[in-house]
Design a protein with these regions (language model features):
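Short, well-ordered coil/turn segments that N-cap beta-strands
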Residues: 5-11, 35-37, 64-69, 95-99, ...
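Active-site nucleophile and cofactor-binding loops and adjacent substrate-binding regions
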Residues: 47, 71-79
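Flexible, glycine-rich active-site loops centered on histidine and acidic residues
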Residues: 1-18, 77-144
Length: 188
């Protein structure tokens, strides 16, 4: 079944997929209705069940060969960017280059930052540095980093993402600082 939509528009669904069965059913429905993308959020500790976004989107990518998959948004400042860069590059491979990495600082639930041992007031600066670290790691070349929050010796992350330079990074947020960060560091 096809929904008659203006071909210049793209339609996606931001959803919470609490089970594997729901993920499959929603993915198949979006494919049938010719949606363009599916987006999931991220929280460490939340009031409702939220699965890990990388694992969910890998499942979506296995069920659909055409849907763009994206995070909206991944709370990157709560994590070290090196393993996250590997997860994102892997999802880019599993999706055939259909991954958009939406990131943001969150912060509405301070207990999440406390649970991760990350000072909430550092979240903006950590996000900015994390984006720089991931772009380096996605270059396909040996790189090192010596920054304010993260440092590591020369490493060569392989394989590089399917998308040259890595998945597109979109920054979400509501503050002036978030808008400036998006303009400086993001692809959207």
């Amino acid at each position: 079944m096809s929904v008659p939509l203006d071909e210049t528009y793209r339609y996606g669904l931001m959803t919470r997929l609490p089970t594997a069965q729901t993920t499959r059913a929603i993915t198949e429905l979006l494919d049938e209705l010719e949606f363009d993308s599916i987006w999931v959020g991220d929280h460490i500790a939340f009031t409702t069940p939220i699965l890990d976004p990388f694992l969910q989107l890998a499942q979506v990518a296995a069920y659909s060969s055409r849907l763009t998959v994206g995070t909206g948004v991944y709370l990157l400042p709560m994590r070290h960017p090196t393993p996250v860069a590997k997860q994102a590059a892997s999802l880019d491979h599993l999706s055939g280059g259909r991954f958009i990495f939406g990131v943001g600082v969150g912060g509405e639930f301070p207990a999440e930052y406390a649970a991760c041992g990350v000072p909430r007031e550092e979240r903006g600066a950590r996000l900015s540095e994390s984006i720089a670290v991931m772009r380096k790691l996605w270059s396909g070349e040996p790189v090192y980093h010596d920054g304010r929050f993260f440092a590591f010796p020369e490493v060569h992350m392989q394989p590089a993402p399917v998308q040259p330079g890595g998945p597109r990074i979109w920054c979400g947020g509501r503050s002036n600082a978030a808008l400036r960060r998006a303009g400086r560091l993001a692809d959207g």
